[in-house]
Amino acid sequence: MASVAIVGEGPGGLSAALFLAKNGHEVTVFGTDKTAMNYAYLHNYLGIPEIEGTSFQRIAKRQVTGFGATLSDEEVTSVGIEDGFVVTTESASITVDYLILTEGKNPVLARSLGVAEDESGAIKVDRDYRSSLDRVYVVGRSARPERSQAIISAGAGATAALDILALEAGNNVQDWETPPKG
């Protein structure tokens, strides 16, 4: 199974973590609880009539750790490329196969890797949220600053995760189940 580091613990990062961990991949999510979700009150998230952003985050974190993802409250200080991606915090480094960046409106790590940007400074991505650097995905406000919504970011994270699952499987992957019979 692949190893994946996700920098950012908003809806995009946690959605990607859910899909990947649920399917047996080794996932570490880095976040310092500075997501804009802490200031949100959601009325427009399908399936949830309304919820405070902090409650949403608490539920989402519990869900992803329930599937085996690891949450780290350490800030990522740098990312390098060496037999994969070396993700460094103040106290440790890990090497992973894939990197998903959900850095918000200031994509410092994406820029440090030299990924392509458009004329507005948004990180250029394809429809699967792949950046110009192989195995680096950028989701959320960094890629779509004009479309910053929790549900859009969650969909972007899911899209990136499904692309990684497909690459690892060697064919398209769908992640859904039928309800238990009974």
Where are these regions (language model features)?
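Short hydrophobic core segments
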Residues: 5-7, 94-105
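A conserved short coil-to-beta-strand element within the FAD-binding core of flavoproteins
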Residues: 72-84
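Glycine-centered tight beta-turn/hairpin loop motif at sheet-sheet or coil-to-beta transitions
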Residues: 89-92
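A conserved FAD-binding loop/helix module that cradles the flavin
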Residues: 139-182
